Amino acid sequence: MVSFCATLIRQFRHRSAAAFQIAESAILANKSITLASSACSVNRGQLQFGIQIVREYSKASKMSTLPRVFFDMTADNEPLGRIVMELRSDVVPKTAENFRALCTGEKGFGYKGSIFHRVIPNFMCQGGDFTNHNGTGGKSIYGNKFPDENFELKHTGSGILSMANAGANTNGSQFFICTVKTAWLDNKHVVFGEVVEGLDVVKKIESYGSQSGKTSKKIIVANSGSL
C-alpha cells in the first residue's frame, strides 16, 4: 500500500507539481478543497485527487510503522505454520512492547518453546506461560505484573490479540487470540493487536481444543521473533 501510494504521488507530482504542493499544504493547514483551489489556478479535480493520494499515503505510512511479530507453531512436533501479528503500539505502547520483546527473547526470556495451554473452540486460544507451562505463571519484561494500559481497543472478532489476566492490573506474559467476537471481555482485558497472517493456523490450533481448555495435542511456539 505504501509503495503503491508513493508511486501515485510521484506520478501526480510529475503531472502537476503545483497541484501537489497545494494539496499537501491544504492538508497541513487543514484547509478545504474549495478554499485551496480558489487561491490558485489549479484544476479542482486535480487538487481533490492530490489530497486523496497524500492522505492515503500518510495513512499507509503510519500503518506500516506498527511492529509485527510471528509465531512458528507445531502440534505434537508437526509444523502447523506461521502466525503473524501486528501490535498496536500507537494505542497501547507499553503492552505492545512487552509482547514484542517476549517474541524476540531479547530480555533473556520469552515465548519461544512455550505452549498454548488453554484452547476453547468458538472462544479463544491462550498461551504465554513460559515459566510454569500450565497457566499459573509467566512474567512481563517490566517485572512480574504491570497495570492495564487502557481499554480503547475492543474484542471485535477472530484474530484479536488480548492480554490474559487474573483481575485488574495483573498483566504478565499470558495472552489469548480470539476465534470469535468476545465483547464481554471489553474493558476487562487489554487488546493490543491482531493476527494479520495465519488465521488458518489459529483455526487449526482451535481444532485441538476442548470445552475444558485441554488440548488434544501439544501446541508449541517452536520459534518466535519480530519482522
From Swiss-Prot:
Keywords: Cytoplasm, Isomerase, Phosphoprotein, Rotamase
Regulation: Binds cyclosporin A (CsA). CsA mediates some of its effects via an inhibitory action on PPIase.
Name of this protein: Peptidyl-prolyl cis-trans isomerase
Pfam families assigned: Pro_isomerase (PF00160)
Gene Ontology terms, MF aspect: cyclosporin A binding; peptidyl-prolyl cis-trans isomerase activity
PTM sites of type Phosphoserine: S158
Family, similarity comment: Belongs to the cyclophilin-type PPIase family. PPIase A subfamily.
Organism this protein belongs to: Drosophila melanogaster (Fruit fly)
CDD domains with a match to the protein in the record: cyclophilin_ABH_like
EC number: 5.2.1.8
InterPro entries assigned: Cyclophilin-like_dom_sf, Cyclophilin-type_PPIase_CS, Cyclophilin-type_PPIase_dom
Function: PPIases accelerate the folding of proteins. It catalyzes the cis-trans isomerization of proline imidic peptide bonds in oligopeptides.
Organismal lineage: Eukaryota, Metazoa, Ecdysozoa, Arthropoda, Hexapoda
Compartments in which it is found: Cytoplasm
Predominant place of localization: cytoplasm
Domain PPIase cyclophilin-type per the UniProt entry, residue ranges: 70-226
TM region(s), chain numbering: none
PANTHER family: PEPTIDYL-PROLYL CIS-TRANS ISOMERASE, PEPTIDYL-PROLYL CIS-TRANS ISOMERASE D-RELATED
Catalyzed chemical reaction(s): [protein]-peptidylproline (omega=180) = [protein]-peptidylproline (omega=0)
GO CC terms, sorted: cytoplasm; cytosol; mitochondrion; nucleus
An individual GO BP term: protein folding
